[in-house]
Design a protein with these regions (language model features):
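C-terminal cap/loop subdomain of S1 sulfatases and analogous C-terminal strand-loop tails that border
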Residues: 41-156
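Flexible loop/turn segments at secondary-structure boundaries
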Residues: 18-19, 78, 106-108, 166-167, ...
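Short intrinsically disordered coil segments
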Residues: 24-28, 112-119, 173-175
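Substrate-binding rim/cap in mid-to-C-terminal beta-strand-loop elements of soluble/periplasmic
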Residues: 1-48, 52-67, 150, 168
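Active-site-proximal beta-strand/loop segments in catalytic clefts of secreted hydrolases
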Residues: 13-15, 73, 101-102, 161
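Long, internal low-complexity/basic segments
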Residues: 138-155, 160-236
């Protein structure tokens, strides 16, 4: 959601920025920074990089076409059974946010059971705070708690102009089906182009990476990586 992904980016480069002091509303990704640095240094950008250099924006070009930003999430804190993450991908345009949750049966904010969290806290993706405690324990805030911690559908679609905080999911609304299908296809095309294993069917190893933090709950551990995954990802 925008609350976690829409962040400011400030760049200072006296020799490389034309008409400095500008504010650009172009959609960019962190993955665009590496090719920007390489291009600025006169180094060829490897084909494996999926980001696009920001040189056109820095040079003040007005016909820049950056119509979408792509977002991904896998595992953050170890707060689900077996150390699994919450795989999702998203596409953000100037008008819409479309999210694909690949395993909607998992808890997006972490399990409500302490035993599944490496830190032994409920909904471990959200750090402890008085606000979190009140939301979990006070019945009158049940709706807010569900928005923050509850399970989510396989697809989410939000109209930014009418819903800046992304609270009203339009993915199943008839009048937005064409928009949903178009954004779904754009996201799929990007994931295929970038070789994302969540879409290509290749082994997705994020759920099996080891955790290097001592668990507070006895017996907590990451699920072992399947043998076929180990063979598929041997480094040559």
């Amino acid at each position: 959601y925008d609350a976690g992904t829409h962040v400011p980016l400030a760049i200072r480069w006296p020799k490389g920025i034309r008409t400095p002091g500008r504010v650009s509303h172009s959609l960019v990704n962190l993955s665009d920074l590496a090719p920007t640095f390489l291009e600025a240094a006169g180094i060829s950008i490897p084909k494996m990089m999926t980001g696009k250099a920001l040189t056109d924006i820095l040079q003040g070009k007005t016909n820049v076409k950056r119509e979408a930003a792509f977002i991904a999430m896998e595992r953050h804190a170890g707060c689900r059974e077996g150390g699994k993450g919450y795989p999702c991908r998203a596409i953000r345009t100037k008008e819409y946010l479309y999210i694909r949750n690949f395993d909607p049966d998992r808890w997006p904010a972490g399990s409500p059971e302490r035993k599944h969290c490496v830190r032994h806290i409920r909904y471990g993706e959200v750090d402890p705070s008085p606000t979190k405690t009140v939301m979990m324990d006070e019945p009158k805030y049940a709706k807010l708690a569900d928005l923050a911690f509850g399970k989510r559908p396989a697809e989410e679609l939000y109209l930014i102009s009418n819903d800046p905080h992304q609270l009203r999911n339009l993915a199943d609304a008839k009048e937005f089906q064409k928009t949903r299908d178009l954004l779904r296809q754009q996201l799929d095309d990007h994931l295929k182009k970038s070789g994302d294993p969540r879409l290509t069917g290749k082994p997705a190893l994020w759920d099996y990476y080891p955790f290097y933090r001592a668990p507070k709950f006895p017996g907590w551990k990451v699920a072992p990586m399947p043998a076929e995954f180990q063979k598929a990802h041997k480094v040559k």
